[in-house]
Amino acid sequence: MINIYGKGGHANVINSILSQTHSKQINFWNDESYEKEVGDFDHYNNNIKGDWIIAIGNNKNRKKVAELLGNDCYITVTHNSAIIDANINPGEGSQILHGSVIQVGTKIGKHCIINTAASVDHDCILGDFSFIGPNATLCGGVEIGEGTFIGAGAVVLPYIKIGKNCMIGAGSVVTKNLPDGITAYGNP
């Protein structure tokens, strides 16, 4: 059995991928209170068998659920159209969507989302709970900190380091290193 924690569009995408690649029963779970106050995650952890995937696009909420669920049976979800170097081992709970390309030497942390048609070039490092938006491009040697969001169509130039919990706007071009907690957008 596979348990999807989440609802909405991203959970539907994950369900679609799993339906094509797994013959196991798929169950949906969510708790409306995770955005405000956490529900009874011990019930989920102790009483529900099978593998888990957290299908929540918001990095902070995904991390909160992972910490509270505390389950160590997370699966990685990869669409069969993604092109991934044979030596890449994404962290548990990570999700690699349709048409993404991930090159040699890249390290992907736990519970990352690499969205539709994103390109992650050689030797990149993606921190836990990071999000790479649709059609975003990370050039070679880029480092993305934990919990950082890279918006749709953004480009991060080679060997740039972006700190933890940053927000890079859609269509932006990142040309210099950014410290933790920065919101950046635009194209120089």
Please name every model-derived segment:
Residues 55-57, 98, 187:
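Glycine-rich, N-terminal phosphate-binding loop of Rossmann-like dinucleotide-binding domains
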Residues 1, 53, 116, 125-128, ...:
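Glycine-rich hexapeptide-repeat left-handed beta-helix
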Residues 9-12, 60-61, 173:
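Short alpha-helical
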Residues 21-36:
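NAD(P)-binding Rossmann-fold cofactor-contacting core
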Residues 70-123:
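Hydrophobic, well-structured mid-protein blocks that either form specific transmembrane helices
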Residues 1-18:
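Glycine-rich adenosine-cofactor-binding loop
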Residues 33-85:
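Phosphate-bearing ligand-interacting subdomains
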